Amino acid sequence: MDEASHLPNGSLKNMEFTPVGFIKSKRNTTQTQVVSPTKVPNANNGDENEGPVKKRQRRSIDDTIDSTRLFSEASQFDDSFPEIKANIPPSPRSGNVDKSRKRNLIDDLKKDVPMSQPLKEQEVREHQMKKERFDRALESKLLGKRHITYANSDISNKELYINEIKSLKHEIKELRKEKNDTLNNYDTLEEETDDLKNRLQALEKELDAKNKIVNSRKVDDHSGCIEEREQMERKLAELERKLKTVKDQVLELENNSDVQSLKLRSKEDELKNLMNELNELKSNAEEKDTQLEFKKNELRKRTNELNELKIKSDEMDLQLKQKQNESKRLKDELNELETKFSENGSQSSAKENELKMLKNKIAELEEEISTKNSQLIAKEGKLASLMAHLTQLESKLNQRDSQLGSREEELKKTNDKLQKDIRIAREETVSKDERITDLQKKVKQLENDLFVIKKTHSESKTITDNELESKDKLIKILENDLKVAQEKYSKMEKELKEREFNYKISESKLEDEKTTLNEKISNLAAENSQLKNKIEDNSTATHHMKENYEKQLESLRKDIEEYKESAKDSEDKIEELKIRIAENSAKVSEKRSKDIKQKDEQISDLTQNLKLQEDEISSLKSIIDRYKKDFNQLKSEQSNIQHDLNLQILNLENKLIESEDELKSLRDSQKIEIENWKRKYNNLSLENDRLLTEKESASDKEREISILNRKLDEMDKEKWNLQESKEKYKRELQKVITANDRLRREKEELNENSNNIRIMEDKMTRIKKNYLSEITSLQEENRRLEERLILNERRKDNDSTMQLNDIISYYKLKYHSEVRHNNDLKVINDYLNKVLALGTRRLRLDTRKGEHSLNISLPDDDELDRDYYNSHVYTRYHDYEYPLRFNLNRRGPYFERRLSFKTVALLVLACVRMKRIAFYRRSDDNRLRILRDRIESSSGRISW
């Protein structure tokens, strides 16, 4: 039954009560070896590699199947005890072998063991624990100091790394802000260019509409002119507003470009600073790498020192345990001898000498224990102060560990943020590249649009100038016509009939020419379909030819529009004259004779105008011929252009049809237009003024276009600057990525170091907790024993004999069970030590063989103490040889042993013994529980 279940607070779960105090079942076992008394002595015990020994028969009957000693009732407490030590020669090996390992405990149990002295042994145990606690406290203090220095250095290094990472993080944030600003600037520039493009398109549309209105303006339709004038005035007002807005935007763009140039300069300076800082960080990182390597070497040295200290502490523990065991053994022997002396008065002088020797040894040991106890008592005060100091240091270490953990989390977060920032920066650089290409395309489109707008503006300017001149001439002619119209009435009728006839003839001719043109266009389309294959090879030439063709088309359009205007003017004049003649027939009858001459002159003028129109028609024909020639030259034009040509030709045909319809409608509307002519004259004068203002506005627009061209050049410069800055950002990003990888590696190394420190600190805390728990358990056990002593003394008079017998039997059983347990553990320990020795010997031999095969010799300063170096099987500078083997009796580590009857019999015997021992163990546990309950009930204390 485990005694720890009755201990308070459950702090001694691993302990078991014995007469000498509490011990742990694994840690505090002694290292003595149980030796069988029937074992055959080995003369070559030191040289186990010399070869296998022949089989020898055991001398005792106890190890055979015929043994019946285990089954006797008298051996209830002696089943698993070690036997008498016999025929064991002293070990010839010297060095690190423990002389007390193979101590025989059978002498301790030759006779009945008297009652032990638990209080005295408890005091010895307490002194021993105090000494161990003091030694371990010193070791923990040294370790704590070393760990504190190392932790401080690590914390300082980590703080430096954290500051560097924070600075890099701040710089990366600034770079991100700058990149976002540049992207926003790109977006604003893109929006502004789109707005400019839309405005230019709107201006182009308005100019086209204006040109159409000017071209399709009717001289005699005064209401249409008034409406057109009002529309033009509205459009001019809108254009002026738009021009103002465009100017404001242009000024804003200029200001933005200045601001961006300043920002770019500042960014360049910041980039230079960042480059310098990155170089400094690299140099610092290299220095820190060297420092880390140096610290790693120091850590290794310190770990080696710690291992050595642990080994020394274990050796000291073993020595103390051995001394305790020796003192116990001597006390037990003394007690046995005293009992024997009291029982048997006639004892030999040899035993008296042994008693004296044992008493002297006990006295010496007690003096040593007393001195050590005094030293321990003196050192306990120091230990208390050291423990307080240690607690303070541990609290500081915990605080710093928490700080390190928070900083490590911050480092992880910053590392993740840096990686995200790098990814975002890469994506932004890609998007920047795409946006830059889009901006380049848009700039090219804007340049083309500006070129087209300039052309259209110059053309519209020439058209407006021509219109103004023609309108001035028309006004003068109309004034003369108003005066002379009545006189020319009679002549105009004849001339009108002739002109109508000639007009019909010209219309028929125009229709014939139109049909011929359509046929030629169809032929040209067929030729164009044949020459599509050649278009791909001559794309550059076609582009220039396309521009020439567009110019020629524009010239054709102008000529056709001028021809229409002249035809309309002539028809308008004819209709006006007809209307005037019809209205003024009554008034003109008296003045007819006078006006005939004037009408003749007008007829001559009209004939001249008709001749001019015929010349214009012939010029149109020549233009069409030129168009044919140019079209033959432009055989490599694209299919889209052909489609546009067809549309334009259809538009021309529709315009011709519309012109015919307009001629008919003009004939009907001329009667109404004469009445409104004067009003129209005034309107025309106003329009003249308006057109003059339009000239001025056109010159302003030209200035604006020049300003826009300058802005486009500036935007191109900004684009190149931004591309350069983009490349710089890419280089910086690569540097930041490399720095981030380096910092990540350093952080991992720091995490490893911090984990090692935490492991060591956890070990220290565990050791400290174990010591404190042991101290508390010992104090409580001491208090409990003192209380039990007091209670026992009070009840001594009542039932002393019965209680003493119970206590004696209880402690006797307890002692015997502990001795058996210790002996079993010793056997296990010796077996494991043998296995370890064989394994290490095999490894050493194999390593020596490998070194010899590779011609590697040990250095001269190798002072390791290894027993097998001096063996005749293998020396330091001789060839490797395997030990001698017997062919008939193959035993040893290199051959499997042959099973024999004796091994099987011994196995069966061991099983029977194990069963018997388990049975007696259970019976002993039951007896112990009964005795403990009886003692506790008799002492007045019941433990549940």
From Swiss-Prot:
Bias kind Basic and acidic residues: ranges: 96-110
GO terms assigned for molecular function: structural constituent of nuclear pore
Q: Does the keyword RNA-binding apply?
A: no
Stretches of Polar residues bias are at: 28-46, 67-78
Give the matching Gene3D superfamilies.
Answer: 1.10.287.1490, 6.10.310.10
Record PTM Phosphothreonine, positions in chain: T18, T64, T68
Localization, per the record, is: Nucleus; Cytoplasm, Cytoskeleton, Microtubule organizing center, Spindle pole body
Q: Enumerate the residue ranges of region (Disordered).
A: 23-110
**Keyword Coiled coil included in the entry's annotation:** yes
- Signal peptide stretch: none
Q: What UniProt keywords apply to this chain's record, in alphabetical order?
A: Coiled coil, Cytoplasm, Cytoskeleton, Nucleus, Phosphoprotein
By its UniProt entry, which Pfam families does this protein fall under? Spc110_C (PF18520)
PANTHER family per the record?
NUCLEOPROTEIN TPR, NUCLEOPROTEIN TPR-RELATED
Q: What is this protein called?
A: Spindle pole body component 110
The protein's organism comes out as Saccharomyces cerevisiae (strain YJM789) (Baker's yeast)
